[in-house]
Regions:
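Short amphipathic alpha-helix that is part of the acyltransferase structural core
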Residues: 1-9, 105
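Structural motif corresponding to alpha-helix initiation and N-cap regions
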Residues: 8-12, 65
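A conserved beta-strand-loop-helix scaffold within acyl/acetyltransferase catalytic domains
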Residues: 13-52
Length: 113
């Protein structure tokens, strides 16, 4: 699966990110990784879904829905679940899971590379 993000240039950091994530859910076709979602959470008030990735060859096969459904089960008792979609075209996908855009919330990023 290709990662169309800057973090894909740092495979050793990605491995560490998986190990240090609160929840990681993956989808496989045999021994091929075809989907992945990971999150960080304090398991009390808030979780951040860092990204949801699906191999382009497997998109439109409901893999993203399966990954979201599985990871969201971990957040039933939290006050907030945050996500920062990297592509505007994915916003309707997240809206199906109850995510909304609010005028008084803005995401900010500090790039250190």
């Amino acid at each position: 699966m290709s990662i169309n993000r800057e973090s894909g240039k740092y495979p050793e950091k990605l491995a560490g990110a998986m190990e240090n994530s609160t929840y990681v859910v993956s989808a496989w076709d045999g021994d091929k990784l075809v989907g992945l979602v990971r999150s960080l959470s304090d398991d009390e008030t808030v979780a951040f879904i860092h990204y949801l990735l699906v191999d382009p060859e497997y998109q439109k096969c409901h893999i993203g829905d399966g990954l979201m459904s599985r990871i969201m089960k971990n957040f039933d008792n939290l006050l907030y679940v945050n996500i920062m979609p990297s592509e505007p075209k994915t916003i309707p996908f997240y809206e199906r899971y109850g995510f909304k855009r609010y005028d008084n919330y803005s995401a900010m990023v500090l790039k250190k590379f």
